[in-house]
């Protein structure tokens, strides 16, 4: 995939920031990357290793890189929602693996709010670096991803890679192009779309 000058500058910036904070930067030429538990995804940031990983053989790779770099900034800045999520994310993954968890609604809410904060950061990053991304569409996809956390509370499962919330056209089209939605709880209208689309 040919990269633009601005994309190359952004990649270098992310690599430099990763080096500065002793984070391994792994940009992999694949469509998906595999997380613990054999979960396919497009990327992640893990503060424990620490490592930033992005699958780059996909059309939305630059958006994913902006998103994962946004998580790195949350960690570096130690924003309050990041600190809360240090406990909650582990609880959410344990719950998805079948373990009972008290207060799962609270923990999923923290994970959702972490992603909402991060999606807003990603939009600022995309604008700052002048990356070629349709921001209205990106925000719709971001809203679908954030709302997915509410749906996950109902289904107790992660989405399938081929039918993820940000890839499902009907779900994305139902989202706002601004970060102005009701994020808690899932509205009946959106719940019906998630159910109909089998996400």
Question: Can you say where each PLM-predicted feature lies in the sequence?
Answer:
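Active-site scaffold of zinc-dependent metalloenzymes
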Residues: 4-7, 12-61, 69-76, 82
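Alpha-helix boundary/N-cap detector
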Residues: 2-5, 9, 113, 137
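Post-HEXXH active-site segment of zinc metalloproteases
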Residues: 75-115, 139
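An active-site-proximal "capping" alpha-helix that borders the catalytic cofactor pocket
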Residues: 111-128
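Pan-zinc metallopeptidase signature
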Residues: 88-96, 101-102, 125-199
């Amino acid at each position: 995939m040919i990269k633009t000058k601005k994309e190359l500058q952004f990649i270098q910036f992310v690599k430099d920031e990763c080096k500065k904070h002793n984070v391994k930067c792994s940009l992999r030429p694949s469509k998906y990357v595999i997380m613990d538990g054999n979960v396919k995804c497009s990327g992640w940031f893990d503060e424990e290793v620490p490592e930033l990983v992005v699958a780059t053989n996909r059309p939305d790779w630059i958006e994913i890189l902006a998103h994962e770099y946004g998580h790195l900034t949350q960690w570096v800045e130690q924003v309050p929602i990041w600190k809360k999520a240090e406990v909650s994310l582990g609880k959410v993954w344990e719950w998805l693996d079948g373990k009972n968890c008290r207060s799962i609604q609270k923990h999923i809410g923290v994970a959702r709010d972490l992603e909402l904060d991060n999606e807003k950061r990603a939009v600022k990053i995309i604008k700052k670096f002048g990356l070629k991304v349709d921001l209205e569409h990106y925000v719709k996809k971001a809203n679908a991803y954030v709302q997915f956390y509410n749906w996950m509370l109902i289904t107790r499962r992660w989405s399938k890679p081929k039918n993820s919330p940000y890839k499902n056209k009907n779900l994305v089209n139902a989202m706002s192009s601004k970060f102005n939605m009701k994020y808690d709880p899932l509205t009946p209208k959106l719940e019906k779309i998630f159910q109909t689309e089998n996400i």
